[in-house]
Regions:
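Acidic/glycine-enriched edge-of-secondary-structure segments
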Residues: 51-65, 136-146, 168-169
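Structural signal for conserved beta-strand scaffold positions within catalytic alpha/beta enzyme cores
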Residues: 54, 85, 113, 133, ...
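A contiguous loop/helix-start segment that scaffolds small-molecule binding in enzyme catalytic cores
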Residues: 2-5, 78-83, 96, 139, ...
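Short glycine/serine/threonine-rich phosphate/pyrophosphate-binding segments
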Residues: 16-18, 92-97, 117-125, 151-153, ...
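Short, charged, surface-exposed secondary-structure boundary motifs
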Residues: 61-67, 122-124, 152-153, 205-208
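Class I S-adenosyl-L-methionine
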Residues: 1-15, 20-114, 217-218
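Short, acidic/small-residue loops that bind anionic groups at enzyme active sites
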Residues: 102-123, 134-141
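A short alpha->loop->secondary-structure connector
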Residues: 105-108, 131, 186-192
Length: 240
Protein backbone atom coordinates (compact mmCIF):
# COMPACT_ATOMS: atom_id res chain seq x y z
CA UNK A 1 0.00 0.00 0.00
CA UNK A 2 1.35 3.41 -1.00
CA UNK A 3 1.54 6.08 1.66
CA UNK A 4 0.56 9.73 1.54
CA UNK A 5 2.48 12.99 1.89
CA UNK A 6 1.26 16.12 3.64
CA UNK A 7 3.19 19.26 2.80
CA UNK A 8 2.78 21.14 6.06
CA UNK A 9 3.61 24.82 6.49
CA UNK A 10 5.22 25.36 9.88
CA UNK A 11 4.99 29.14 9.94
CA UNK A 12 7.96 31.37 10.76
CA UNK A 13 9.00 29.73 14.02
CA UNK A 14 6.53 30.41 16.83
CA UNK A 15 4.70 27.09 17.40
CA UNK A 16 1.56 29.00 18.38
CA UNK A 17 1.31 30.14 14.74
CA UNK A 18 0.82 26.56 13.52
CA UNK A 19 -2.62 25.81 12.16
CA UNK A 20 -4.81 23.17 13.78
CA UNK A 21 -4.55 21.05 10.64
CA UNK A 22 -0.75 21.27 10.74
CA UNK A 23 -0.70 20.01 14.32
CA UNK A 24 -3.10 17.17 13.48
CA UNK A 25 -0.89 15.98 10.62
CA UNK A 26 2.23 16.10 12.79
CA UNK A 27 0.51 14.10 15.51
CA UNK A 28 -0.45 11.32 13.09
CA UNK A 29 2.67 11.15 10.90
CA UNK A 30 4.95 8.12 10.71
CA UNK A 31 7.79 10.28 9.43
CA UNK A 32 8.53 14.01 9.44
CA UNK A 33 11.05 15.44 6.99
CA UNK A 34 11.75 18.93 8.25
CA UNK A 35 13.55 22.05 7.08
CA UNK A 36 16.20 23.69 9.23
CA UNK A 37 13.88 26.56 10.16
CA UNK A 38 11.02 24.15 10.99
CA UNK A 39 12.80 22.39 13.84
CA UNK A 40 12.79 23.16 17.55
CA UNK A 41 9.47 23.76 19.32
CA UNK A 42 7.40 22.93 16.23
CA UNK A 43 8.63 19.34 16.30
CA UNK A 44 7.27 18.80 19.82
CA UNK A 45 3.92 18.22 18.12
CA UNK A 46 5.25 15.20 16.21
CA UNK A 47 3.96 11.78 17.22
CA UNK A 48 6.20 9.96 19.67
CA UNK A 49 8.12 7.31 17.76
CA UNK A 50 7.88 9.06 14.39
CA UNK A 51 11.04 9.26 12.30
CA UNK A 52 12.35 12.84 12.41
CA UNK A 53 14.66 13.57 9.49
CA UNK A 54 16.39 16.91 8.95
CA UNK A 55 16.64 17.89 5.29
CA UNK A 56 17.04 21.66 5.62
CA UNK A 57 19.11 24.00 3.50
CA UNK A 58 20.89 27.10 4.81
CA UNK A 59 23.13 29.53 2.98
CA UNK A 60 26.81 29.04 3.66
CA UNK A 61 26.61 25.50 5.04
CA UNK A 62 26.55 21.97 3.62
CA UNK A 63 22.97 20.95 2.81
CA UNK A 64 21.20 17.95 1.28
CA UNK A 65 20.74 18.12 -2.47
CA UNK A 66 17.16 18.62 -3.65
CA UNK A 67 17.18 15.33 -5.59
CA UNK A 68 18.12 13.52 -2.38
CA UNK A 69 15.27 15.18 -0.47
CA UNK A 70 12.74 14.27 -3.16
CA UNK A 71 14.01 10.69 -3.29
CA UNK A 72 13.78 10.35 0.48
CA UNK A 73 10.20 11.63 0.41
CA UNK A 74 9.23 9.08 -2.24
CA UNK A 75 11.02 6.22 -0.48
CA UNK A 76 9.19 6.85 2.80
CA UNK A 77 5.81 7.07 1.08
CA UNK A 78 6.40 3.85 -0.87
CA UNK A 79 6.66 1.98 2.45
CA UNK A 80 3.04 2.96 3.12
CA UNK A 81 3.94 5.65 5.64
CA UNK A 82 2.03 8.82 6.39
CA UNK A 83 4.69 11.42 5.73
CA UNK A 84 4.81 15.08 6.73
CA UNK A 85 7.12 17.28 4.70
CA UNK A 86 7.49 20.21 7.08
CA UNK A 87 8.47 23.48 5.41
CA UNK A 88 9.06 26.81 7.11
CA UNK A 89 6.73 29.75 6.59
CA UNK A 90 4.15 28.97 3.94
CA UNK A 91 5.38 26.04 1.87
CA UNK A 92 4.16 27.56 -1.40
CA UNK A 93 6.63 30.47 -1.14
CA UNK A 94 10.27 29.89 -2.15
CA UNK A 95 10.23 26.35 -0.76
CA UNK A 96 10.99 24.33 -3.92
CA UNK A 97 7.59 22.72 -3.44
CA UNK A 98 6.98 22.07 -7.14
CA UNK A 99 10.10 19.89 -7.47
CA UNK A 100 8.95 17.62 -4.66
CA UNK A 101 5.40 17.44 -6.04
CA UNK A 102 6.82 16.44 -9.43
CA UNK A 103 8.71 13.56 -7.79
CA UNK A 104 5.56 12.38 -6.01
CA UNK A 105 3.49 12.55 -9.19
CA UNK A 106 6.09 10.50 -11.04
CA UNK A 107 5.75 7.81 -8.36
CA UNK A 108 1.91 8.05 -8.27
CA UNK A 109 1.94 9.14 -4.63
CA UNK A 110 -0.89 11.28 -3.30
CA UNK A 111 -0.31 14.51 -1.44
CA UNK A 112 -1.97 17.55 0.12
CA UNK A 113 -0.74 21.09 0.79
CA UNK A 114 -1.52 22.74 4.12
CA UNK A 115 -0.97 26.51 4.04
CA UNK A 116 0.56 28.52 6.84
CA UNK A 117 1.75 31.92 8.01
CA UNK A 118 4.54 33.28 5.85
CA UNK A 119 7.31 35.24 7.55
CA UNK A 120 6.25 38.42 5.73
CA UNK A 121 2.89 38.39 7.50
CA UNK A 122 4.49 37.55 10.84
CA UNK A 123 7.10 40.29 10.44
CA UNK A 124 4.65 43.11 9.78
CA UNK A 125 2.42 41.85 12.60
CA UNK A 126 5.37 41.98 14.99
CA UNK A 127 6.29 45.44 13.71
CA UNK A 128 2.73 46.72 14.10
CA UNK A 129 2.31 47.74 10.47
CA UNK A 130 0.15 46.52 7.57
CA UNK A 131 1.30 45.20 4.20
CA UNK A 132 -1.10 47.39 2.23
CA UNK A 133 -2.59 50.86 2.47
CA UNK A 134 -5.54 52.30 0.59
CA UNK A 135 -4.40 54.56 -2.27
CA UNK A 136 -0.64 54.59 -1.58
CA UNK A 137 0.38 50.93 -1.14
CA UNK A 138 -2.08 48.89 -3.17
CA UNK A 139 0.31 46.16 -4.28
CA UNK A 140 2.47 43.62 -2.47
CA UNK A 141 5.26 41.72 -4.20
CA UNK A 142 7.46 38.90 -2.91
CA UNK A 143 10.90 38.27 -4.42
CA UNK A 144 13.83 36.05 -3.54
CA UNK A 145 17.17 37.75 -3.06
CA UNK A 146 19.21 34.63 -3.82
CA UNK A 147 19.29 32.01 -6.55
CA UNK A 148 20.78 28.51 -6.22
CA UNK A 149 24.30 29.98 -6.36
CA UNK A 150 23.59 32.41 -3.53
CA UNK A 151 23.79 35.42 -5.83
CA UNK A 152 21.11 37.85 -6.91
CA UNK A 153 18.80 36.14 -9.45
CA UNK A 154 19.04 37.11 -13.10
CA UNK A 155 16.10 38.63 -14.95
CA UNK A 156 14.53 40.55 -12.08
CA UNK A 157 11.73 42.91 -13.11
CA UNK A 158 13.41 46.08 -11.93
CA UNK A 159 10.57 48.33 -13.09
CA UNK A 160 8.24 46.47 -10.73
CA UNK A 161 10.74 46.24 -7.88
CA UNK A 162 11.45 49.98 -8.09
CA UNK A 163 7.75 50.89 -7.91
CA UNK A 164 7.48 53.45 -5.06
CA UNK A 165 3.82 52.57 -4.53
CA UNK A 166 4.39 48.88 -3.80
CA UNK A 167 5.28 47.01 -0.65
CA UNK A 168 8.17 44.74 -1.61
CA UNK A 169 9.33 41.83 0.53
CA UNK A 170 12.74 40.32 -0.17
CA UNK A 171 13.27 36.80 1.14
CA UNK A 172 16.83 35.48 1.63
CA UNK A 173 18.25 38.83 0.58
CA UNK A 174 20.71 39.96 3.27
CA UNK A 175 23.80 38.95 1.31
CA UNK A 176 22.67 40.57 -1.94
CA UNK A 177 20.69 43.61 -0.82
CA UNK A 178 23.55 46.07 -1.26
CA UNK A 179 23.66 45.14 -4.96
CA UNK A 180 19.87 45.14 -5.26
CA UNK A 181 19.56 48.54 -3.58
CA UNK A 182 21.97 50.09 -6.06
CA UNK A 183 19.97 48.60 -8.93
CA UNK A 184 16.75 49.97 -7.42
CA UNK A 185 18.23 53.44 -7.14
CA UNK A 186 19.57 53.19 -10.70
CA UNK A 187 15.97 52.51 -11.77
CA UNK A 188 14.65 55.60 -10.03
CA UNK A 189 13.68 54.45 -6.53
CA UNK A 190 14.60 57.09 -3.97
CA UNK A 191 17.48 56.18 -1.64
CA UNK A 192 15.27 57.53 1.16
CA UNK A 193 12.60 54.85 0.57
CA UNK A 194 11.74 53.33 3.97
CA UNK A 195 13.04 49.83 4.65
CA UNK A 196 12.71 47.28 7.44
CA UNK A 197 15.04 44.45 8.38
CA UNK A 198 13.35 41.65 10.33
CA UNK A 199 15.60 38.91 11.73
CA UNK A 200 14.55 35.80 13.62
CA UNK A 201 10.88 36.56 12.98
CA UNK A 202 8.54 35.17 15.68
CA UNK A 203 11.41 33.61 17.63
CA UNK A 204 12.75 34.66 21.06
CA UNK A 205 15.66 36.52 19.42
CA UNK A 206 13.49 38.43 16.96
CA UNK A 207 14.87 41.84 15.99
CA UNK A 208 13.25 44.50 13.82
CA UNK A 209 15.17 47.55 12.64
CA UNK A 210 14.20 50.53 10.50
CA UNK A 211 16.30 52.02 7.71
CA UNK A 212 16.11 53.58 4.27
CA UNK A 213 17.14 51.38 1.36
CA UNK A 214 20.44 53.28 1.17
CA UNK A 215 21.23 53.04 4.88
CA UNK A 216 20.21 49.36 4.99
CA UNK A 217 22.51 48.59 2.07
CA UNK A 218 25.37 50.28 3.93
CA UNK A 219 24.48 48.46 7.16
CA UNK A 220 24.51 45.04 5.47
CA UNK A 221 27.69 45.81 3.54
CA UNK A 222 29.48 46.12 6.91
CA UNK A 223 28.64 42.51 7.78
CA UNK A 224 25.61 40.31 8.36
CA UNK A 225 24.47 37.96 11.07
CA UNK A 226 23.66 34.32 10.46
CA UNK A 227 20.05 34.70 11.57
CA UNK A 228 17.35 34.18 8.93
CA UNK A 229 15.85 37.48 7.85
CA UNK A 230 13.63 39.25 5.41
CA UNK A 231 13.71 42.78 4.09
CA UNK A 232 10.65 44.91 3.42
CA UNK A 233 10.74 48.26 1.65
CA UNK A 234 8.14 50.72 0.45
CA UNK A 235 5.86 53.42 1.87
CA UNK A 236 4.74 51.28 4.83
CA UNK A 237 8.19 50.14 5.97
CA UNK A 238 8.43 52.57 8.85
CA UNK A 239 7.55 52.54 12.52
CA UNK A 240 4.04 53.87 13.13
Amino acid sequence: MTGFVSFVSSGPGDPELLTLKAVARLQSADAVLFDDLSSGPVLTHARQGADLVGVGKRAGRASPKQDHVSRLLVDYALTGAKVVRLKSGDCSLFGRLEEEITALNAASIGYEIIPGVTSASAAVAAAGIPLTRRLTARRVQFVTGADVTGGLPDGLNMAALADPGATTVVYMGKRTFAVLAQMLMDHGLSPDTPAMLAEGVSTPDQQIEWFTIASLAAHLADGISTRPALILYGPLAQDL
